[in-house]
Amino acid sequence: MHILTAGVDEAGRGPLVGSVFAAAVILPETFDLPGLTDSKKLSEKKRDALAEMIKEQAAAWYVAAATPEEIASLNILHATMLAMKRAVDGLAVRPEKIFIDGNRIPEHLDIPAEAVVKGDSKIIEISAASVLAKTARDAEMYALAQRHPQYGFDKHKGYGTKQHLEALKQYGVLPEHRRDFAPVRNLLAQQTLF
């Protein structure tokens, strides 16, 4: 008998701007998608194509986020766990077991769950969740780039690259920036000194 399992993964823990995203995916027993692996190992074009196929073929999927404000109030780890719980709670189908990428399980899940280190390369449901979380996170960065092209979010996806840090210094901190992350926090502290 097939056990209905969900895979859960996150995207966007490290960037200096934007939400952290999590996805939960339940795949049908017969699901087969060649090339599906950890989203970080895929080109953006391949990820986007796979995301559409996953959404079409999954038994259930849901993408959730925790905002920069929630990241600031909870810290990035707890905000990530919150996004993961929201993703699981948003599934239209209730899984019997959950596999979560990493070494931690969100609190207050009422479904048996197991953390799997490097699960996005080992368990297909986690690989699928990895792709959906990453494409949702990238979509947020493209939308932010439309509103604030001078920051280059479409290129660096919010990570603390030289280009991003220079834009921060030149144009200032946006409401979407994570004020508790050191480069942003340090810049804000410098600005209050002058």
Curated annotation (Swiss-Prot):
All residue ranges annotated as the RNase H type-2 domain in the record: 3-193
Top-level taxonomic group: Bacteria
A Pfam family: RNase_HII
GO molecular function, one term: RNA binding
Residues binding a divalent metal cation: 9-10, 101
Catalytic activity, EC: 3.1.26.4
GO CC annotations, alphabetized: cytoplasm; ribonuclease H2 complex
Subcellular location: Cytoplasm
Cofactor binding, per record: Manganese or magnesium. Binds 1 divalent metal ion per monomer in the absence of substrate. May bind a second metal ion after substrate binding.
Coiled coil (UniProt feature): none
Disulfide bonding pattern of the chain: none
EC class of the enzyme, as a word: hydrolase
GO BP: DNA replication, removal of RNA primer; mismatch repair
Protein name: Ribonuclease HII
The family this protein is said to belong to: Belongs to the RNase HII family.
Biological role stated in the UniProt entry: Endonuclease that specifically degrades the RNA of RNA-DNA hybrids.
Annotated organism of origin: Neisseria meningitidis serogroup C (strain 053442)
UniProt catalytic activity: Endonucleolytic cleavage to 5'-phosphomonoester
CDD domains assigned to the protein according to its UniProt record, in alphabetical order: RNase_HII_bacteria_HII_like
Keyword Manganese: yes
